[in-house]
């Protein structure tokens, strides 16, 4: 690969795992996939979990290990959020399933449906028959955020694997590998900021790392929060723990609201900060989270005003005074 092309390639693609052993987190599920690769007989499967934790990548790694050199011809990947309708099942998927290929003995073609929970009910119903007719030659892998949006008849035909959110340690491990390979200048608070904003989403973490390097060169907390354009947690923490309500409201108005952060930005960062407020008693912290949650609910209902946030701070200030 030329240096120019390497620079243009997003790091999330450049450092995408190629084998199952390279995937971080969800060890038990990855162990099951490695056993499937070893046995050589892949069942239909549904992999569910939040975005950016390696669901689709895991299926590609499994396909690489099962099909070897036949991978390019033997795998069809469709993003079901784009190709959602019944025509895709009748045309692309059916034609691929009918196609004759010379694969290693005992191996099957693989159809990967990313974001399968976005498929229409009609398309999912049509897929039932296709799966039955071509199960001898083709296996299906569904990657989705919510497995309950896959119709019951498809679920009953599949092994269901659930991926949990990646831990901060898992995300940090992969970031440090990339930082070493790319010779990135960073500070510890910069890494903490990337992990904080990613919330267990590896894809988001790697994209934020590359964006910060491209935009500022140095990965520190201030640069990361400028890139991701979310409220700085230290400012939010100061707002939540201010000794009097007037100071809290002043921080909200001057450092957050007037700088253009939305109600959702402020309330979600407040939630993440509050979860980790070790200096606040757990009982008080839980009440604070409850108030933040109620405010979040009102904002999602369409009342995302400054007044809602000020009311939230007044209630949190009252809780802090009781403590």
Swiss-Prot record:
<dbReference type="InterPro" id="IPR013748">
    <property type="entry name" value="Rep_factorC_C"/>
</dbReference>
<keyword id="KW-0067">ATP-binding</keyword>
<dbReference type="GO" id="GO:0016887">
    <property type="term" value="F:ATP hydrolysis activity"/>
</dbReference>
<dbReference type="GO" id="GO:0006281">
    <property type="term" value="P:DNA repair"/>
</dbReference>
<dbReference type="Pfam" id="PF08542">
    <property type="entry name" value="Rep_fac_C"/>
</dbReference>
<dbReference type="GO" id="GO:0005524">
    <property type="term" value="F:ATP binding"/>
</dbReference>
<dbReference type="InterPro" id="IPR008921">
    <property type="entry name" value="DNA_pol3_clamp-load_cplx_C"/>
</dbReference>
<dbReference type="GO" id="GO:0031389">
    <property type="term" value="C:Rad17 RFC-like complex"/>
</dbReference>
<comment type="subunit">
    <text>Replication factor C (RFC) is a heteropentamer of subunits RFC1, RFC2, RFC3, RFC4 and RFC5 and forms a complex with POL30/PCNA in the presence of ATP. Component of the RAD24-RFC complex which consists of RAD14, RFC2, RFC3, RFC4 and RFC5 and associates with the checkpoint clamp DDC1:MEC3:RAD17 complex. Component of the ELG1-RFC complex which consists of ELG1, RFC2, RFC3, RFC4 and RFC5. Component of the CTF18-RFC complex, which consists of CTF18, CTF8, DCC1, RFC2, RFC3, RFC4 and RFC5. RFC4 interacts with ECO1.</text>
</comment>
<feature type="binding site">
    <location>
        <position position="145"/>
    </location>
    <ligand>
        <name>ATP</name>
    </ligand>
</feature>
<dbReference type="GO" id="GO:0000077">
    <property type="term" value="P:DNA damage checkpoint signaling"/>
</dbReference>
<dbReference type="Pfam" id="PF00004">
    <property type="entry name" value="AAA"/>
</dbReference>
<keyword id="KW-0131">Cell cycle</keyword>
<keyword id="KW-0539">Nucleus</keyword>
<dbReference type="GO" id="GO:0007062">
    <property type="term" value="P:sister chromatid cohesion"/>
</dbReference>
<comment type="function">
    <text>Component of ATP-dependent clamp loader (RFC and RFC-like) complexes for DNA clamps, such as the POL30/PCNA homotrimer and the checkpoint clamp DDC1:MEC3:RAD17 complex. During a clamp loading circle, the RFC:clamp complex binds to DNA and the recognition of the double-stranded/single-stranded junction stimulates ATP hydrolysis by RFC. The complex presumably provides bipartite ATP sites in which one subunit supplies a catalytic site for hydrolysis of ATP bound to the neighboring subunit. Dissociation of RFC from the clamp leaves the clamp encircling DNA.</text>
</comment>
<keyword id="KW-0547">Nucleotide-binding</keyword>
<dbReference type="GO" id="GO:0005829">
    <property type="term" value="C:cytosol"/>
</dbReference>
<dbReference type="GO" id="GO:0005663">
    <property type="term" value="C:DNA replication factor C complex"/>
</dbReference>
<dbReference type="InterPro" id="IPR003593">
    <property type="entry name" value="AAA+_ATPase"/>
</dbReference>
<keyword id="KW-0238">DNA-binding</keyword>
<dbReference type="GO" id="GO:0031390">
    <property type="term" value="C:Ctf18 RFC-like complex"/>
</dbReference>
<dbReference type="InterPro" id="IPR047854">
    <property type="entry name" value="RFC_lid"/>
</dbReference>
<dbReference type="GO" id="GO:0031391">
    <property type="term" value="C:Elg1 RFC-like complex"/>
</dbReference>
<dbReference type="InterPro" id="IPR003959">
    <property type="entry name" value="ATPase_AAA_core"/>
</dbReference>
<dbReference type="GO" id="GO:0006272">
    <property type="term" value="P:leading strand elongation"/>
</dbReference>
<dbReference type="GO" id="GO:0005634">
    <property type="term" value="C:nucleus"/>
</dbReference>
<dbReference type="GO" id="GO:0007064">
    <property type="term" value="P:mitotic sister chromatid cohesion"/>
</dbReference>
<protein>
    <recommendedName>
        <fullName>Replication factor C subunit 4</fullName>
    </recommendedName>
</protein>
<comment type="similarity">
    <text>Belongs to the activator 1 small subunits family.</text>
</comment>
<dbReference type="InterPro" id="IPR050238">
    <property type="entry name" value="DNA_Rep/Repair_Clamp_Loader"/>
</dbReference>
<dbReference type="InterPro" id="IPR027417">
    <property type="entry name" value="P-loop_NTPase"/>
</dbReference>
<feature type="binding site">
    <location>
        <begin position="49"/>
        <end position="57"/>
    </location>
    <ligand>
        <name>ATP</name>
    </ligand>
</feature>
<keyword id="KW-0235">DNA replication</keyword>
<dbReference type="GO" id="GO:0003677">
    <property type="term" value="F:DNA binding"/>
</dbReference>
<feature type="binding site">
    <location>
        <position position="203"/>
    </location>
    <ligand>
        <name>ATP</name>
    </ligand>
</feature>
<feature type="binding site">
    <location>
        <position position="12"/>
    </location>
    <ligand>
        <name>ATP</name>
    </ligand>
</feature>
<feature type="binding site">
    <location>
        <position position="24"/>
    </location>
    <ligand>
        <name>ATP</name>
    </ligand>
</feature>
<dbReference type="GO" id="GO:0006261">
    <property type="term" value="P:DNA-templated DNA replication"/>
</dbReference>
